[in-house]
């Protein structure tokens, strides 16, 4: 439970609509949250928690979960994606082997309900599954994850599911790997040219995404859609964590996504990106930065001003800590 002072779900729904946020990611299937977003225009990505993956090895359990936790709210609540686990593959322990079987059971349950074409499913990974690659055209997956990545990629391809990844340029900055302008989308000229492709890049977000594009292409999955399920910037807790840098990163990210085109190597691929997070999380474990990725305080005032434009029918995505646990106390 990462936050004990959040507003009520219906207040959150009003805030999200008022902010012109069209796509929302939550981390479980909290019924109060699903109910709050019924009869809104917001598209919801709901999650299966890591703690539930063992139970999701049972088809009857998953069938029951879909029947009781999703179908009563659908389609009044516009659920478009189910994420199965969060960065599970990175842990390289026995639990990583639970992800694909759990997803198979989710697919089977969706097929039974005839919803497999309406609700997409995948599992968000962190960028740790990629080998450090420079230039991007030499992007490959880390061999450490081969045993779990091979069945996962085959499964995603077979079901036309997106590859979901959490990308945080902030950590490259925090580790001293990059210049601030390059990380904050402030470089007007190209920072490097990929000698293999001749393509130039002026921000690390595109470079990281193209490492993934090439890693997929090298495995013959170049047509697989990518969704960035988390990115963001903290406002406290490290020298580079500040309100100014967070506002600059997220504002420039939104502009970059809205302006198109895609990345240097995949210019025709529409960028789908979720900003983490809607609220600060006062109980989250770990460094102070982890508690300070929010765009809003729990009282729903802004940590900093961020405009979510509605341009040409394209609108914005947010990952919300609102439902990190289904046992949130309201």
Set out the residue ranges of the language-model regions:
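Soluble non-cytosolic domains of exported or imported proteins
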Residues: 6, 60, 93-100, 199, ...
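Internal amphipathic alpha-helical repeat/solenoid segments
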Residues: 10-16, 28-38
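Substrate-binding and catalytic surfaces of secreted/luminal carbohydrate-active proteins
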Residues: 13, 104-108, 117-123, 129-130, ...
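Short acidic/polar active-site loop segments enriched in Thr and Asp
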Residues: 22, 80, 222
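General structural concept
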Residues: 22-33, 43
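Conserved residues at the C-terminal ends of beta-strands
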Residues: 24-27, 85, 166, 276
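Substrate-binding cleft of extracellular glycoside hydrolase catalytic domains
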Residues: 34-144, 228
